[in-house]
Every structure is written in structure tokens, then in C-alpha cells.
């Protein structure tokens, strides 16, 4: 059985990730801008993003691969949209730092240093400390008695899962850990917790897509349009076009 990372190890890795995430974020976002659509942002950074349900292990969150000079990210849509947004920045970490490789599994975040750092990086990208503190100040939130409604509104602002938000708040406000840990109760994978989370989300006028698997299949039309256009204009050979289509096939096969 693999040992879980200790609190001391997590704190060490977290502190090492902060400057890396801050530097990475400056390249594509303003200091006080939340990321409204992580998929679009990653595509604008030049990545081929494919999203579809894993035909294998539901614990698979995604993976990054370089193929035929293309940077490709696969995201498993069997998971909630909030988790998918974390997963795509998790994979961006593997690209950006070259730390870790292969398939990413949610369960490994607590045991594997590279996976923990990748999830921590994603949290820092999606919820930078300065924006979190600004949000809490503007909305007059008292963390020692924060309500589920306040948390869900905050979750929707940052476009993350509730669990990811709570993890990030504990990182930024360790003195409020005891109270915040109690709020994990409605993030559990059981009927009572799921029902409560859905009810609170509707009360807060939140986006229920963030708390549900989307199970969508997404391959950008631009991929096929660009491929056809380049082929018709003799910018690439038939062999190259076939090679690119094989990339798609390999991504599908890797999720089985």
C-alpha cells in the first residue's frame, strides 16, 4: 500500500509550487482576473484539447502527451465539470514543468508528489491567493462561520469543484482549517451528500454543471477544418494528415 503524503511534505510542495504557478499565470491572465472557461483558455495557448468519457477507470482524470509536434490534453468527462477544470490545469503543469508523465488519477493526488504538485498548481492557477482574499473581503465573508451558500457562490465565481475550493481556502487560511474541513461533508460521494449539494447549489443559483459529470464528447471542429484546409492547399501531405488522425485514435485508445 502506498503511503499518503505527510502534512509536512504537502506544505513543502505547496510552497514550492506557488512561484511556479504565479509565473505561469502571468503569461496569459491578468492579476485579478478569474478564469471563466479553462478549456477555451488552454486552447488559446495552442493545445489540442479532447474531452470524452473514459471507457476504462473512472478515477482517470486526464493526461498530457506530445505527438507529432502537437501538445494534446485529454480530459475525462465522466467527472464533474468542476473537476475537469482542475484536471486541465493539472495536465498543463505536467507540460509546463516536465514533472510527471503518463495517466493522471485523482486518487494518486494524496500519495504521488508529482500528482499532488500538479493539483496544487491547478488550484493556484484557478484561485490565486490575491483574488481569493479580494473576493472574501468584498463579500464580507467570515471564514470561521462560512455557510454552504457562500461557499457555492464562491465556487461558481472561480469555476471549480467545492472540494478544490475548500482545499485552496485551507492552504491560504490554515488557522480556519477545523471549520473548513467540516464543510467537506457535502462533497462526499454518497446519496445524502450529493442531494444536499444539489439543493444548496440551486438555493445559491449556482451552476449545477459544476457538480455533475458532463459525459460529453468534444473534439474541436477547428482540428478537422485546419486538417482539411492544410491538405487541400498542399501544406501537409496525406501521410501527415493520417498521422494526425492517428493521434486522435491513440488518445481514445489510451482511455480504455
Residue ranges and their predicted role:
Residues 1-256:
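Active-site hotspot residues in diverse enzymes, especially metal/ion-binding acidic/histidine motifs
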Amino acid at each position: 500500500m502506498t503511503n499518503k503524503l505527510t502534512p509536512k511534505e504537502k506544505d513543502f510542495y505547496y510552497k514550492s509550487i506557488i512561484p511556479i504557478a504565479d509565473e505561469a499565470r502571468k503569461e496569459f491572465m491578468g492579476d485579478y482576473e478569474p478564469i471563466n472557461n479553462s478549456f477555451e483558455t488552454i486552447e488559446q495557448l495552442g493545445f489540442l484539447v479532447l474531452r470524452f468519457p473514459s471507457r476504462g477507470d473512472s478515477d482517470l482524470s486526464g493526461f498530457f502527451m506530445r505527438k507529432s509536434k502537437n501538445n494534446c490534453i485529454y480530459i475525462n468527462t465522466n467527472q464533474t465539470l468542476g473537476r475537469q477544470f482542475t484536471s486541465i490545469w493539472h495536465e498543463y503543469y505536467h507540460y509546463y514543468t516536465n514533472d510527471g508523465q503518463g495517466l493522471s488519477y485523482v486518487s494518486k493526488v494524496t500519495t504521488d508528489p508529482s500528482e499532488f504538485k500538479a493539483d496544487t498548481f491547478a488550484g493556484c492557477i484557478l484561485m490565486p491567493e490575491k483574488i481569493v482574499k479580494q473576493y472574501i473581503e468584498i463579500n464580507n465573508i467570515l471564514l470561521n462561520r462560512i455557510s454552504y451558500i457562500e461557499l457555492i457562490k464562491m465556487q461558481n465565481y472561480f469555476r471549480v469543484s467545492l472540494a478544490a475550493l475548500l482545499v485552496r481556502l485551507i492552504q491560504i487560511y490554515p488557522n480556519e482549517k477545523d471549520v473548513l474541513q467540516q464543510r467537506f461533508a457535502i462533497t462526499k460521494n454518497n446519496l445524502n451528500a450529493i442531494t444536499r449539494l444539489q439543493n444548496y447549489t440551486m438555493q445559491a443559483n449556482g451552476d449545477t454543471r459544476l457538480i455533475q459529470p458532463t459525459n460529453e464528447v468534444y473534439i474541436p471542429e477547428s482540428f478537422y477544418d485546419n486538417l482539411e484546409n492544410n491538405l487541400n492547399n498542399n501544406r501537409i501531405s496525406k501521410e501527415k494528415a493520417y498521422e494526425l488522425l492517428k493521434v486522435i485514435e491513440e488518445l481514445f485508445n489510451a482511455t480504455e
